[in-house]
């Protein structure tokens, strides 16, 4: 029996390549339809979080000077966005900090007097249970009204109660608050 090289080796490869091309184009098409919707939903979610953290604000304008975004510890504690309320009532700062499960993203609202109006963790990779206790609303509430910090570390700052057993996660949240307060000072307030 004579073997047919094309049928045995080349034809299956051609078929698989064609299938891969069809699937690739189908995924690209679906992505082109869904990407703008996903982006719009992300913008709406961020705007809702800003409104929650600074209820006195009507609308926000992004602080555009990217060279003046605070970076307390390169790659570990840095501001990614700063939005200033158009009515001068304050600002909302988005910060990424190193936490137990990787980078933690939090938003911090600061009023026009430099006091924190709220803190919200929007993304994290911390361990569910103990690690996420540092992200709980009852833990984050302790920062409301704060306008300065005594120490960069949550454990060493007497004005903050850190979560015992979740020091790295507690520090991640605290670092973000410190970076947001530094951003407020650097921008010169909310005016």
Indicate residue ranges for each PLM-predicted region.
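Flexible, solvent-exposed loop/hinge segments and secondary-structure transition points
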Residues: 2-191
């Amino acid at each position: 029996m004579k073997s047919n090289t094309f049928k045995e080796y080349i034809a299956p490869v051609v078929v698989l390549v064609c299938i891969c091309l069809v699937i690739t184009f189908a995924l690209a098409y679906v992505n082109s339809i869904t990407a703008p919707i996903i982006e719009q939903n992300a913008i709406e979610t961020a705007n809702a979080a800003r409104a929650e953290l600074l209820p006195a604000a009507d609308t926000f304008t992004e602080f555009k000077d990217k060279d003046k975004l605070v970076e307390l510890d390169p790659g570990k504690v840095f501001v990614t966005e700063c939005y200033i309320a158009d009515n001068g009532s304050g600002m909302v700062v988005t910060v990424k900090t190193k936490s137990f499960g990787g980078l933690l993203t939090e938003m911090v609202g600061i009023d026009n007097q430099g006091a924190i109006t709220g803190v919200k963790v929007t993304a994290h990779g911390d361990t569910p249970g103990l690690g996420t206790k540092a992200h709980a609303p009852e833990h984050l509430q302790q920062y409301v009204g704060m306008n300065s910090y005594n120490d960069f570390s949550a454990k060493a700052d007497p004005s903050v109660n850190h979560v015992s057993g979740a020091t790295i996660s507690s520090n991640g949240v605290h670092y973000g608050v410190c970076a947001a307060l530094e951003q407020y000072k650097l921008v010169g307030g909310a005016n």
